[in-house]
Amino acid sequence: AAMRERRSGETPRGIPINWYYTFNQLPDDSEQPCLVVAQEFLDVFPVHQFVYKDGLWLEKLVDIDHTAESPLHFRMVLSQAPTPASITLMGNAKGHQFREGDGVEVSPVALATCEEIAGKVCKSGGAALLVDYGANATSSDSLRGFKDHETTNILSLPGLVDTTADVDFDACGRVAARRGAKVVGAIPQ
């Protein structure tokens, strides 16, 4: 909360610093470099999970579990038909070789954010360092929940469990490169 209240300041040597909460708040100033440092930022954006079944991409969805045995009262199910998200996000993946049951996770918000960061950085001659969970590949089922620093089922205690998913740094790098950014790539910690 204290960080939200403080919107500007300066270093001990008098260099001004400004904090912003969205990238569109950043000034379009090509005379000053834009430096972005983000830790565990991209992994919190929503993900869509898809499973390849009978030649179609079906989406994993949350459903109500009416069984008496279920302590969570929610369950993950596959859509019965392609969803608008599976058509939009996976429609161009039909030419690839996928096997029955293959899964893919996609975060359109993380990709759009990387594209926006790249645009700002390229325009200003700055740089970005994004430190996060992930790999140089697409995950299929990395969505997980955390509560009190422990891994927990994402469907338990809705609204009280933090969710996270691995970042696809390869996909993020591709969208950044399309905006003109020089991408170094994911480096293991």
Summary of predicted features, one role per range:
Residues 2-32:
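S-adenosyl-L-methionine
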Residues 21-189:
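Class I S-adenosyl-L-methionine
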